[in-house]
Amino acid sequence: MKPKQLLSMLACAALAAGTLAGCGGDTQTTEERPTVRIFNRVNAEVQFDKNNEAVKALEDAVNVNLEIEAPPPSSYNDKLQITMASGDLPDIIYLFQTDNNFDTWAKNGLLLPLDDKIDQYPNLKDNISDEMWALTKAPSTGQISAVPKSNTTSHWGYVVNQKWLDALGMEPPTTLDEFYEFAKAVATQDPDGNGAADTFALSPSAQNTAGASVWGEYFLMSAFNLQQYANRSDVDGQYKPKEQFEGYYPYLTFLRQLYEEKLIDPEFFINKDGESSEKLLQNRVGMISGHDGAAKGLFGKASTEQVISDYCYYPPLADNDTGEVVQYIPPAMWGCWGIAANSKVADAALRLLDYGNSEEGWLLTNIGVQGVHYESYDPATKELIRTDVQSEKSRSEMSAYTPFSVTYHGEPAYISLCDTTEKLQKYNSELERYLSVTKEVSVPTVNSPKYIALNANNPDLFKKRDQMEIQYVTGEITLEELQDFIENEFLPKTAEADQETAELLRAATEQ
């Protein structure tokens, strides 16, 4: 579809939406339209006022009025809890996780079951996979209780300081041994040239219940046949929690070695989320773990000149035993949209979500209105051209959080944060290189009722595990102490939930 066709197609979609609403082909006046209330997390600079032209275009396309309440991501979960307990629910509610809260709200009748409604909305059926729909089934009821938000597939690897590689005369690491040599060189050969021993290979900054976590270093975990979530079998073909994977203790022991030898940031355990990216930009660390979205995020923060000369994105390390470069890919879903069970405009709310999953609605909610939010758009290359005024307009009226679907048939509308042709070309070429050497294997994601309840009812158990893993890496406890806790305290308490998860994964794999 050519960009110049977008507005005319939106006009046609508005007429079609009016027909679906039972208007006999005549659109309703704004006073007659149903009002759909939306509760969604959105960054604070986005303003949903009467002048928001992205919202106005969406209202006209679907023939509804929208009232949008949008707490910022930092406070969204607290506001969500208050809203769900208030008895006055918005019609559409963004839910980041299908966790114990989701299951409880569905069980208590707060969320509308959708099993008998999906067939009425062709775009929801077309754009959302069966695997994603399965993830929005509430375990307690067995009913689909939300509409999945389709997202881009994450290709995990690492971003490295290319200038440091050049200064050290090294190639990007592809194996664990090569990574270790790179880490030693970064720590001992002064790649930034400031004369101080203040550079490190890594500074992990993923977060869990204990604060900073070592379970975000996917590119490194791949060498040990690990990923954060054990939604695939181990080398013996058995489904098991990650604490029982053969690579679990060797991975943590390798990190302990790096820490003892001062090859990773000695203060990583106090990092905040995303702090590793800032340290890469500040020439304090040599690489960060992340998917291609992290690469785009870094590209967005750096100048075009820096992106071209300073940073490169590479695949994860090869498996130590097989030599393969493998990434395991679960269904790409970024939360979901619940419909209030007592909504008086549930059909209009579903019609809105259906439109957001059509090609026209997906483009509108992701890139906006041509001439207002962008100048031109090439769907083949995903190049999106905006003037400075249009860029500012887009930032104040739209966000990555606002689309009802990030992807259409698995593809994003554009490559976010690659805001110049040069950045986009570099990103595309590096992703192509990544895909040429990486074997990607689809794996299921399941919701175990027992595991959901276990997490909700035993937060201290998981926090203790997270803390002890960090304590082992930093040398505060021995391997024997960690093993004693995992094998004699943690795993016995998770055994029933682990067994149920394994059974669900086996069943999902056999489908």
Question: Over which residues does each language-model region extend?
Answer:
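Short helices/loops that flank or line small-molecule/ion binding pockets
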Residues: 77-89, 181-186, 275-284
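C-terminal motif of bacterial Sec signal peptides marking the signal peptidase cleavage site
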Residues: 18-22
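Conserved small-residue motifs centered on glycine
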Residues: 41, 355-471, 476
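Ligand-binding "clamshell"
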Residues: 103-116, 143, 298-324
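Bacterial N-terminal signal peptides that target proteins for export
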Residues: 1-10
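Conserved N-terminal structural module of periplasmic/extracytoplasmic solute-binding proteins
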Residues: 8, 23-178, 228-231, 239-243, ...
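Helix-loop-helix "hinge/cap" segment bordering the ligand-binding cleft or interdomain interface
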Residues: 115, 139-213, 230-275, 279, ...
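Loop/turn elements at helix/coil->beta-strand transitions in domains of secreted/extracellular proteins
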Residues: 33-36, 62-66, 87-91, 140-145, ...
